């Protein structure tokens, strides 16, 4: 009976240890996935920021060109 108790405790202990290891690996994997998601979000944010800056610059140049063309048209009409 004593051997049976020791065997049962050993099996339960080893099961608990393996469960603990699995939970730890699962947590590490979740942390890695979260970190990858954060990195992707940062990359997307940087891409959008760059695109919006370029779009703003293009819009500014287009606006200046349109104003210049309008001014030329007005000045030609007054001559």
From Swiss-Prot:
Pfam families associated with the record: DD_K, FSAP_sig_propep
Superkingdom of this protein's organism: Eukaryota
UniProt entry keywords in alphabetical sequence: Amphibian defense peptide, Antibiotic, Antimicrobial, Antiviral protein, Fungicide, Immunity, Innate immunity, Secreted, Signal
Prosegment residue ranges: 23-45
GO BP annotation list: defense response to bacterium; defense response to fungus; innate immune response; killing of cells of another organism; regulation of defense response to virus
Tissue: Expressed by the skin glands.
UniProt main location, coarse: secreted
Signal peptide: 1-22
GO terms under cellular component: extracellular region
Subcellular location: Secreted
Membership in a protein family: Belongs to the frog skin active peptide (FSAP) family. Dermaseptin subfamily.
Cited function: Antimicrobial activity with potent activity against Gram-positive and Gram-negative bacteria, fungi and protozoa. Also stimulates the microbicidal activity of polymorphonuclear leukocytes. Probably acts by disturbing membrane functions with its amphipathic structure. Does not show cytotoxicity on lymphocytes or KB cells. Does not show hemolytic activity. In vitro, shows spermicidal, antiviral, and anti-leishmanial activities.
Protein name: Dermaseptin-S1
């Amino acid at each position: 009976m004593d051997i049976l108790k020791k065997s049962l405790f050993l099996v339960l202990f080893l099961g608990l240890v393996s469960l603990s290891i699995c939970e730890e690996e699962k947590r590490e994997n979740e942390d890695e996935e979260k970190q990858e998601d954060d990195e992707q979000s940062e990359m997307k944010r940087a891409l959008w920021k760059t695109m919006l800056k370029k779009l703003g610059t293009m819009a500014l140049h287009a606006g200046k060109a349109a104003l210049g063309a309008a001014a030329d048209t007005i000045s030609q009409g007054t001559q």
